Amino acid sequence: MQYKKSLVASALVATSLAAYAPKDPWSTLTPSATYKGGITDYSSTFGIAVEPIATTASSKAKRAAAISQIGDGQIQATTKTTAAAVSQIGDGQIQATTKTKAAAVSQIGDGQIQATTKTTSAKTTAAAVSQIGDGQIQATTKTKAAAVSQIGDGQIQATTKTTAAAVSQIGDGQIQATTKTTAAAVSQIGDGQIQATTNTTVAPVSQITDGQIQATTLTSATIIPSPAPAPITNGTDPVTAETCKSSGTLEMNLKGGILTDGKGRIGSIVANRQFQFDGPPPQAGAIYAAGWSITPEGNLAIGDQDTFYQCLSGNFYNLYDEHIGTQCNAVHLQAIDLLNC
């Protein structure tokens, strides 16, 4: 009997040592491996957009909506595919919607519909992720190009609709539009959750004066002219997308492999494998609180892994570093520069 009690006590001690306690040095909670060529210091404030890996191979130009964050730091996204920006609510969660929209085509004077075939700007315009209060990252099931927001708890949430820039019309009636898809920024609500829509919006087609409708084979979004972010100091800038930030947009900084949001909370993988922002220090039981980087492809990575999973939770997706259930899809978290515009 005494032997059994000793085994139980040993198991409890081992379990407690495997998780973070508030008094521990949380900055040492790093994965054992690092991403080859990853950047652990980035000089500019940036956001993230959820990019389903299934679409990455087919088109690097198509971006998912940026993630939002609610107050508790969680990251979430909706299931409809929209171009809505991802927001962050108060808890730090990240959330985003899932609806996809196309950019409008422009028309010139002759009535033709036209769209450009190349984007002149070096950076793609994407919507930023918002954050709610709890720091969690979440996304809605509709696919929109809306920016990801963050709510109060730090969770990250985003909708699933992808939105594209509207197409313009020139004097001859032709419709013209650019060729890159712009994603909405992820927002953050009070709890730190990250949210973003998943609907993809296509930009409207433009029309020139002759009435012809023209458009290129690639869907593009309007590039926002703005000053370039400050250059990074340890290599080529891997971030190729940018967006205008707005209230609730998840704003992140990366320094020495430590990821923080606009409120100074620590980006971490918590005990249930969810990505959210807390603290400092991170919440008890956190698995990783350091070891973040931006890959040469412009994706957020933890350790040597740049694949995350958006898993359906009610009307939103939460973001995890592991596949935890049947309603989970592999995604990349694309870094996007945030602009004041």
Curated annotation (Swiss-Prot):
Site location (Cleavage): R63, A64
Compartments it resides in: Secreted, Cell wall
Record InterPro entries: PIR1-like_C (IPR054508), Yeast_CWMannoprotein_PIR (IPR051153), Yeast_PIR_rpt (IPR000420)
Main location: secreted
Residue ranges listed under propeptide: 19-63
GO cellular component: cellular bud scar; extracellular region; fungal-type cell wall; nuclear periphery
Sequence ranges of the PIR1/2/3 repeats: 64-82, 83-101, 102-125, 126-144, 145-163, 164-182, 183-201, 202-220
Signal peptide: 1-18
Expression induction or repression: Positively regulated by signaling through MPK1 in response to cell wall perturbation. Expression is also regulated by the SWI5 transcription factor.
Pfam family, one: PIR1-like_C
Annotated positions for site Covalent attachment to cell wall glycan: Q74, Q93, Q112, Q136, Q155, Q174, Q193, Q212
Keywords associated with the record: Cell wall, Cell wall biogenesis/degradation, Cleavage on pair of basic residues, Glycoprotein, Repeat, Secreted, Signal
PTM annotation: Covalently linked to beta-1,3-glucan of the inner cell wall layer via an alkali-sensitive ester linkage between the gamma-carboxyl group of glutamic acids, arising from specific glutamines within the PIR1/2/3 repeats, and hydroxyl groups of glucoses of beta-1,3-glucan chains.
Cell inner membrane in keyword set: no
GO molecular function terms listed in the Swiss-Prot or TrEMBL record: structural constituent of cell wall
An annotated GO BP: intracellular protein transport
Domain comment, as recorded: The PIR1/2/3 repeats are required for covalent linkage to the cell wall. Their number varies among different strains of S.cerevisiae.
Protein family per UniProt: Belongs to the PIR protein family.
Purpose of the protein: Component of the outer cell wall layer. Required for stability of the cell wall and for optimal growth. Required for resistance against several antifungal and cell wall-perturbing agents and for tolerance to heat shock.
Note: Present with 1170 molecules/cell in log phase SD medium.
Protein name: Cell wall mannoprotein PIR1
